[in-house]
Amino acid sequence: MAKAKTVDARHYDVILAPVITEKSTLLSENNAVVFKVARDATKPAIKAAVEALFDVKVVGVNTLVTKGKTKRWKGKPYTRSDVKKAIVRLAEGQSIDVTTGV
């Protein structure tokens, strides 16, 4: 059994929130979990944060950036913030319950 990684306060700045959608629920059947992460987070930082916070073995990390939509408020256009998501693949037999808090 691998030694548990120590939790650093910076790990909480990397992982912002779980993404709970129909598509992410389907991915969870294949040992994958989707998180909203910081814009400047790298794949190794995301992997280290998930392994330390949830005590699981991460096999791989895929990231994507969703560009913010242009909206209107009182007739004036503005742009919503860009969002970075990480699809984290876990080792076989491991899972993360995203309905519980960290």
Curated annotation (Swiss-Prot):
The keyword Ribonucleoprotein applies. SUPFAM superfamilies: Ribosomal proteins S24e, L23 and L15e. GO terms for cellular component: ribonucleoprotein complex; ribosome. GO terms for biological process: translation. One of its GO terms (molecular function) is structural constituent of ribosome. Pfam families: Ribosomal_L23. Keywords: Ribonucleoprotein, Ribosomal protein, RNA-binding, rRNA-binding. One of the early assembly proteins it binds 23S rRNA. One of the proteins that surrounds the polypeptide exit tunnel on the outside of the ribosome. Forms the main docking site for trigger factor binding to the ribosome. Part of the 50S ribosomal subunit. Contacts protein L29, and trigger factor when it is bound to the ribosome. Belongs to the universal ribosomal protein uL23 family. This is Large ribosomal subunit protein uL23. The lineage of its organism: Bacteria, Pseudomonadati, Pseudomonadota, Alphaproteobacteria, Sphingomonadales.
